[in-house]
């Protein structure tokens, strides 16, 4: 076939051949926003093809299906190339960009195999991936207007999962809980104070609900936050709270003051939950095992030396037993640690 372009004014321009040539003609050739070709057609991943022009690119791959080759503006390309082009997590572009109206402002969105690129009204290009991209595009008009344009890129959370910041909120994703939306406001502010998903509430698991009177509720892995219409936030008791409340006065006295609290790491059995570290011990809680307490003795010291719940013993599943002679025993998912009355500590793992 004939090449789409052979010359660019006085200078010779590379020819655009094959599948990209038809798309180039369709958008208007050198008189379009693409301008003149800069490089001949080149091969991409898995049999794809691309051509570079003065102001953008044309990409083709069979994943585009009936859409055929698509254009990409230079600013989107420059952000995408930082993620390793079509070889990276986003894969190939599968649509031309199109306008998207949010809250009275207009930006643009372009689809990729595994996400989207969004150009904001301020001309920032943001990449959204996977479930977060799908959720954003699936929001109704009112919810999307409330959330706004993306204000950040796809980012990893402190515990396994991802989030994207928006002008007025955040979309979270985790393997266990899928996607959920929280908006800026009193509940978001309290969640931030508590350490977001790494704090004692864990991941957001349901969309924040905003009622007609302005009150709000958000459900997390390990608790619920509620805000009245005046913005006063209350927190329902977590599993750690309930476990601590069930302890005897003597046990509470032995634990003493709180040092720290938050979500645990994952155990070898896949268990995650909450912990509250006291001066004299730790209270744990998980959905699988409920609440359990362990005190600051040689038993806890050995457990700590192996990596706590993420180590070879796994999660604490029962309260540490304290016998009349001073000996102690703690049972974990994958073994037991004991201390005799003389303070000698031994650990045994299940086969």
Model features per residue range: what roles?
Residues 1-351:
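Extended, compositionally biased repeat/scaffold regions that form elongated interaction surfaces
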């Amino acid at each position: 076939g004939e090449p789409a372009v052979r010359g660019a004014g006085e200078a010779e321009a590379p020819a655009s051949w094959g599948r990209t040539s038809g798309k180039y003609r369709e958008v208007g050739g050198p008189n379009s926003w693409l301008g003149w070709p800069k490089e001949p057609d080149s091969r991409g991943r898995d049999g794809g093809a691309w051509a570079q022009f003065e102001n953008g690119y044309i990409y083709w791959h069979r994943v585009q299906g009936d859409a055929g080759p698509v254009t990409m503006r230079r600013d989107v390309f420059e952000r995408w190339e930082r993620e390793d082009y079509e070889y990276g997590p986003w894969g190939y572009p599968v649509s031309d960009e199109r306008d998207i109206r949010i809250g009275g402002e207009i930006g643009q969105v372009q689809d990729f195999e595994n996400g989207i690129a969004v150009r904001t009204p301020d001309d920032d290009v943001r990449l959204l991936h996977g479930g977060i991209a799908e959720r954003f595009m699936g929001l109704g008009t009112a919810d999307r207007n409330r959330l706004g344009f993306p204000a950040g890129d796809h980012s990893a959370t402190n515990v396994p999962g991802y989030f994207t910041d928006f002008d007025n909120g955040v979309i979270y994703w985790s393997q266990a809980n899928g996607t959920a939306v929280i908006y800026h406001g009193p509940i978001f502010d309290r969640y931030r104070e508590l350490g977001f998903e790494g704090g004692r509430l864990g991941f957001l698991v349901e969309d924040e609900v905003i009622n007609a009177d302005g009150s709000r509720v958000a459900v997390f892995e390990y608790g619920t936050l509620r805000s009245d219409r005046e913005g006063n936030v209350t927190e329902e008791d977590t599993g750690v709270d309930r476990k601590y409340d069930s302890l005897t006065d003597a046990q509470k006295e032995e634990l003493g003051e709180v040092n720290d609290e938050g979500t645990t790491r994952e155990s070898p059995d896949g268990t995650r939950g909450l912990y509250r570290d006291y001066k004299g011990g730790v209270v744990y809680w998980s959905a699988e095992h409920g609440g359990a307490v362990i005190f600051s003795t040689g038993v806890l010291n050995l457990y700590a030396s192996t990596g706590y719940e993420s180590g070879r013993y796994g999660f604490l599943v029962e309260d540490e037993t304290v016998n009349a002679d001073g000996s102690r025993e703690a049972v974990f998912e994958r073994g037991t640690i004991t201390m005799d009355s003389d303070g000698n500590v031994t650990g045994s793992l299940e086969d």
